[in-house]
């Protein structure tokens, strides 16, 4: 798949919209770029190179790590031609990839998973496929390990299809959005198309015994400033409010939204409307993350002072939010900013990848470190096309500070480790 959709989005002057920016962050960022134009000394190791065969190919989602240090991910190609779910385990002989499930496509099964798989409260893996199912509009699925012990490296897991999207009423094509879970184990997500307006929905899957019921919580209509085409997934706060991002909106640059449930129906509130360059970001593709204080963090694929995207924060204060740009990403090649969700470590540092930035336009891995009211940008690694290219997804960190992720290329893609 090519670079993310909606590449051409018009500029807009943010004007009088209230916006808080740490000016020192811009200064520190500029100094970091001038003082250290090359990536910091890191060691990149390729853990697996996909062949496009039974092991899968062209990963677009990031990884999920379990408590034992194993990694789980998806590929939209390979297997039986419809994609796979894989596990990467470290053994005495090194890293070994096992295919947990091979999608079969058609009406009964999904095809083309491009979002992460995540562990639910019950320990099963949950995810979506962008296609397949009855109408080829995608599915929501779960995977469970074998009940009996399996000594083989290739131990297939059991898939259960929780929902098959049927058309425009219940949403179509869940795409890149990460799923989210509440305390009761209910599942929340987005679809890029479908719904009453045909431009996306936020949905919920409620469990009752062994069955699941889908309900559409909100259908985007792009009337006024509400946004359209949610590319990323959603996150939930402790009160059950739902947060996400869309394209479109009053400035046609994207929005951050909140869904609350004050009565019998869900109500949308636009938390922030992006204004586009040079004063703001545009195209918020990645799923938001939330810290323990309820602050939201996200990225934009483009926009900002450099046009290469931004990293931003939204802080709640009563019924309002304060929006701050933490960093305008440097435009080394300006071929595509971040598309995956940010990752925050225990010290509050933020990590992500860009799809096509870096010195050769093949993407990079970066870190943002807070220092008082400013943030320092560090380019950890520039992919050169030989050691990987075009990372779409998020990164994960282990307890030792090693960083793990996937790249779309070269060939059929890779899983990599970046060691300080």
Across the structure, where does each feature detected by a protein language model lie?
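Extracellular beta-propeller repeat domains
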Residues: 2-420
